[in-house]
Amino acid sequence: MNLLIMGLPGAGKGTQAAKIVEEFGVAHISTGDMFRAAMANQTEMGRLAKSYIDKGELVPDEVTNGIVKERLAEDDIAEKGFLLDGYPRTIEQAHALDATLEELGLRLDGVINIKVDPSCLVERLSGRIINRKTGETFHKVFNPPVDYKEEDYYQREDDKPETVKRRLDVNMAQGEPILEHYRKLGLVTDIEGNQEITDVFADVEKALLELK
């Protein structure tokens, strides 16, 4: 089974990806892991990626696409199938993935889209606070400290609501064309992500069993 998982930051995509890998035994292919492995193994694309990263530059699409292609061509993929997590990030990368899969004789079986209302995600992502003395992390709503005094805690700049909202806006603008592309191919299953983790996975599992 060859899968793609999508969802906005904070939707619980990583948690569900780990559960899918555990339950269905597919290879988990996350962008960060792929880059690290390609650079550690000094593959052609890994060396190219490292040359950009060492200069503090963004890795161009053609290199990212090349690293994905290298990984998808490995033997375990044909045996186990895969779950792509964090790629494609743009519609251009989605088209490149289509071409790669066709070239390798693979096909995408389904796209799991974890849906959570953006306003809920702002609350989830902007609630993180850090104790000034201990460095411990808490959440204003989901994991509040026992003796909360506002002056004892601070919030990182990228956890502030306006920053979180901007990040979500960027992700939505990039993600919608990708979802639309796969919807036209009849591959997308939307999963309600604003429920308990176990309930989310029950819905994911049901959808995947129907694909098998």
From Swiss-Prot:
Lineage: Bacteria, Bacillati, Bacillota, Bacilli, Lactobacillales
This protein's UniProt keywords: ATP-binding, Cytoplasm, Kinase, Nucleotide biosynthesis, Nucleotide-binding, Transferase
Gene Ontology biological-process entries: AMP salvage
Chain residues that bind ATP: G10, A11, G12, K13, G14, T15, R128, T137, F138, Q195
Enzyme class name: transferase
Keyword Cytoplasm attributed: yes
Function per UniProt: Catalyzes the reversible transfer of the terminal phosphate group between ATP and AMP. Plays an important role in cellular energy homeostasis and in adenine nucleotide metabolism.
Residue numbers spanned by region NMP: 30-59
Name this protein carries in UniProt: Adenylate kinase
Species assigned in the record: Streptococcus pyogenes serotype M3 (strain ATCC BAA-595 / MGAS315)
EC number: 2.7.4.3
Gene expressing this chain: adk
